[in-house]
Amino acid sequence: MRNYDLSPLLRQWIGFDKLANALQNTGESQSFPPYNIEKSDDNHYRITLALAGFRQEDLDIQLEGTRLTVKGTPAQPEKEIKWLHQGLVTQPFSLSFTLAENMEVSGATFTNGLLHIDLTRNEPETIAPQRIAISERPALNS
């Protein structure tokens, strides 16, 4: 029997918490750049990417439908560097997240090498649950 680790896929589905919690395995895989996904409440999320060595102008964020894509292309150094040890990775990357319906990007900030992307779920009133008042008289005349 084969076991498939879906956790890398599920971590990138923002707003599908019940599905992710039901299917997520304990296995974790690494990707570049490292990132966190925070949930403040049922309607507010934040994606934080660690981007040491990148500048704001090296980054591009695009939302196409429900696909949020973050791309980074670091500037090339003016002169070639001879490394004795290179522990910081500054390579081009493209990272995509699938957002649930009605999720919107409410803002993005880049501070101290961390890119924060804030997300908000905006449910239209037609989808939001409606409370129905119960009257004391029967609805149909009998």
From Swiss-Prot:
Pfam families reported for this sequence: HSP20
All copies of domain sHSP, residue ranges: 26-137
Keywords: Chaperone, Cytoplasm, Stress response
CDD domains (alphabetical): ACD_IbpA-B_like (cd06470)
Principal subcellular localization: cytoplasm
Subunit structure: Homodimer. Forms homomultimers of about 100-150 subunits at optimal growth temperatures. Conformation changes to oligomers at high temperatures or high ionic concentrations. The decrease in size of the multimers is accompanied by an increase in chaperone activity.
Record-stated family: Belongs to the small heat shock protein (HSP20) family.
Protein name: Small heat shock protein IbpB
Source organism phylogeny: Bacteria, Pseudomonadati, Pseudomonadota, Gammaproteobacteria, Enterobacterales
